[in-house]
């Protein structure tokens, strides 16, 4: 404990023990607080020996300050103790821990202002920008460094592989950083094919150059000695200006960024070319029934990059069309998320939609709903449907004959005759010809009602015995079919007479 307590001695220790832990409190700092701080530093893998000097305390404060917002109470207490100890080392008069924290904050703000001022002075004293490809030689003069073959090869490879896809524009912007108009023309001249696109690009550059000449007219009078002439539209395009003039405009005071201006014109023309090479409109991007939502979002934003619209319009397209053109499964999920959902939430919610697992789950839910609906409908039908019964005794509805209170009817309930019951009633309903349907106990109506007569000659013709009189068929037929004569329906037949 003696080694840990030897951090302060003499007058500094007396000053330490006069400082209160809290404003207006009775408790004051003691040697045990130094011992505790030393152990905590050891626990946090920090050197406890840093507490012996003001510089060491400052280093500890720098290490602990980022953890104050998310740290535990022990870290905050350790920071307060080290801040108070720093004030004791610096002989700063304080009464409590709160004053020590305020002093530390003042010192940190002062150091930050000094650092910002030094950085500002450094920028003011700095030389002209040395961005590639304009660099300074040993004499401090700006000179041009040509584009490397590797850069040109990368640009040509992008055009060959991607043609004029939307990603060509950011690639061109990255490869042409700080380039002069001459460098930009070199990049455009390396494109062998796509001459129709190159002609469209030239037309756009000529239009922008004419607009530049209209907005920036030439001043009358001679040019003052030591001054550089103002660039025209053709100068910016690199057709009527030399490389030295371009460097002079870009490094002058004030500088005229002819390279950046020409670069904007080229990007404007590339946007038109990309729009031509991407004939698919953003309105035609729709999600397929089995297409994953992630692939649909990729196609959507690729087409959105090719759209020539402001950022506000593109934001509206993203908020509206992305949900509107999704398939029904994803659209149901996206509408449930609401209009304030982020793209990350949309992709997380629609993850797996369209796959076999999702299809099986949706089908199971649909079948469950249909089954429940049918069960409810069946229950409802059985509940609401009431069978209407009719009494055979009195003929009224609502009860059966067994429970009928009316006097019991004698005889058959169907024909009214006595001597038999309704189940044994032989009354049958006649058909449209007036024929009574045969009984169900007999032969069906489509069967012959009598046996057919044999066509063999009588026995007497064969000399086998006495003549057997054949039964008379006509009276029997009349008995079976008494009302089947056509005369009763259509009158006498003149042909039969």
UniProtKB/Swiss-Prot annotation:
Annotated positions of the Phosphoserine modification: 148
Name of the molecule in the record: Gag polyprotein
Motif PTAP/PSAP motif in this chain: 454-457
Annotated zinc fingers (CCHC-type), start-end: 389-406, 410-427
Residue segments, region Interaction with host AP3D1: 12-19
Region Interaction with Gp41, residue ranges: 7-31
Start and end residues of each stretch annotated as Interaction with membrane phosphatidylinositol 4,5-bisphosphate and RNA: 14-33
Region feature (PPIA/CYPA-binding loop): 217-225
Similarity field: Belongs to the primate lentivirus group gag polyprotein family.
Source organism of the structure: Human immunodeficiency virus type 1 group M subtype J (isolate SE9280)
Motif interval(s): Nuclear localization signal: 26-32
UniProt region (Interaction with host CALM1), positions on chain: 8-43
Modified positions (Asymmetric dimethylarginine) in chain numbering: 408
Start and end residues of each stretch annotated as Dimerization/Multimerization of capsid protein p24: 277-363
Record-linked InterPro entries: Gag_p24_C (IPR045345), Gag_p6 (IPR014817), Lentvrl_matrix_N (IPR000071), Matrix_HIV/RSV_N (IPR012344), Primate_lentivir_Gag_pol-like (IPR050195), Retrov_capsid_C (IPR008916), Retrov_capsid_N (IPR008919), Retrovr_matrix (IPR010999)
Ranges where the record places region Disordered: 436-497
GO MF annotation terms: RNA binding; structural molecule activity; zinc ion binding
Transmembrane regions listed in the UniProt entry: none
């Amino acid at each position: 404990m003696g080694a840990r307590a030897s951090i302060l001695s003499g007058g500094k220790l007396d000053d330490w023990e006069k400082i209160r832990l809290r404003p207006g409190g009775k408790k004051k700092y003691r040697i045990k607080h130094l011992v505790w701080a030393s152990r905590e530093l050891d626990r946090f893998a920090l050197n406890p020996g840093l507490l012996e000097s003001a510089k060491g305390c400052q280093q500890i404060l720098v290490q602990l300050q980022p953890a104050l917002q998310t740290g535990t109470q022990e870290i905050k207490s350790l920071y307060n103790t080290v801040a108070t100890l720093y004030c004791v080392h610096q002989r700063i008069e304080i009464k409590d821990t709160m004053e020590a924290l305020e002093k530390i904050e003042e010192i940190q703000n002062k150091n930050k202002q000094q650092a910002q001022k030094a950085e500002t002075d450094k920028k003011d004293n700095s030389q002209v920008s040395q961005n590639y490809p304009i660099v300074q030689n040993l004499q401090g003069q700006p000179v041009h460094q040509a584009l490397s073959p590797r850069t040109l090869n990368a640009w040509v490879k992008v055009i060959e592989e991607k043609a004029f896809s939307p990603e060509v524009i950011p690639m061109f912007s990255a490869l042409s950083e700080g380039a002069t108009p001459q460098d930009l023309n070199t990049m455009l001249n390396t494109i062998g094919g796509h001459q129709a696109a190159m002609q469209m690009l030239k037309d756009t550059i000529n239009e922008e150059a004419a607009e530049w000449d209209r907005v920036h007219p030439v001043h009358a009078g001679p040019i003052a000695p030591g001054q550089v002439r103002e660039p025209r539209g053709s100068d910016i395009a690199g057709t009527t200006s030399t490389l030295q003039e371009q460097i002079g405009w870009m490094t002058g005071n004030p500088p005229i960024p002819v390279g950046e201006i020409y670069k904007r014109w080229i990007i404007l023309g590339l946007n038109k070319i990309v729009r031509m090479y991407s004939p698919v409109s953003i309105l035609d991007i729709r999600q397929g029934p089995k297409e994953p939502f992630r692939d649909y979002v990729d196609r959507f934003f690729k087409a959105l990059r090719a759209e020539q619209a402001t950022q506000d319009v593109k934001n509206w397209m993203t908020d509206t069309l992305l949900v509107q053109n999704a398939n029904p499964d994803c659209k149901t999920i996206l509408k449930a998320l609401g209009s304030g959902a982020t793209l990350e939430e949309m992709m997380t919610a629609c993850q797996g939609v369209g796959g076999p697992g999702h299809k099986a789950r949706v089908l199971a839910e649909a079948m469950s709903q249909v089954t429940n609906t049918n069960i409810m409908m069946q229950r409802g039908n059985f509940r609401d449907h009431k069978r209407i019964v009719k009494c055979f005794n009195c003929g009224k509805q609502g009860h059966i004959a067994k429970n009928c209170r009316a006097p019991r009817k004698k005889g058959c309930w169907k024909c009214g005759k006595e001597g038999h019951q309704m189940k044994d009633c032989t009354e049958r309903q006649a058909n449209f010809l007036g024929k009574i349907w045969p009984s169900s106990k007999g032969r069906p109506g489509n069967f012959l009602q009598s046996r057919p007569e044999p066509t063999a000659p009588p026995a007497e013709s064969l000399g086998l015995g006495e003549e057997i009189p054949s039964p008379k068929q006509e009276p029997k037929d009349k008995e079976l079919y008494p009302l089947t004569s056509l005369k009763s329906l259509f009158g006498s037949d003149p042909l039969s007479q």
